[in-house]
Curated annotation (Swiss-Prot):
Residues 152-175 are annotated as: Disordered. It is found in: Mitochondrion inner membrane. This is NADH dehydrogenase [ubiquinone] iron-sulfur protein 4, mitochondrial. The modification Phosphoserine is found at S173. GO terms for biological process: adult behavior; adult walking behavior; brain development; cellular response to oxygen levels; cognition; dopamine metabolic process; inflammatory response; innate immune response. The keyword rRNA-binding does not apply. It is a peripheral membrane protein. Pfam families: NDUS4. GO terms for molecular function: NADH dehydrogenase (ubiquinone) activity. The keyword Transit peptide applies. It comes from the Eukaryota. Mammalian complex I is composed of 45 different subunits. This is a component of the iron-sulfur (IP) fragment of the enzyme. Interacts with BCAP31 and TOMM40; the interaction mediates its translocation to the mitochondria; the interaction with BCAP31 is direct.
Amino acid sequence: MAAVSMSVSLRQALLRQRAVATAAVSVCRVPSRLLNTSTWKLADGQTRDTQLITVDEKLDVTPLTGVPEEHIKTRKVRIFVPARNNMQSGVNNTKKWKMEFDTRERWENPLMGWASTADPLSNMVLTFSAKEDAVAFAEKHGWSYDVEGRKVPKPKSKSYGANFSWNKRTRVSTK
């Protein structure tokens, strides 16, 4: 009987440990929720106290960027919408405006024969959702720009039967 009472006391001790562990876990969960709420309230209160600094005149930030002067003042960019891919019928890449930089000095690498350049911006293409955004970006950086208008293709209306016409040179002989 002593072994049975021992196991009962062990069971009771284990149940107490589980209850304490469950209570500790539930107690830990409540403060974390309160901590998140109080942190959010603290952050919300801080945004009300801050004030924005506004500057009326346009500031020149070129000394702060570290970009050489020749890459800023003498730069010309081309703003355009890319043409549709001729190999596919989709118009996926014709919705956004692209800005590409002019080609500066290039030379052929004598070892490998690759085209080399010292211009870090020559191979970079920027993408914009609107033409006005691209123009504003170019003006902000002091670049001169050329805008090429969007070319909308005119659909040619022809019937399916025109593909099999006998009097046109659309049919290809198989022999």
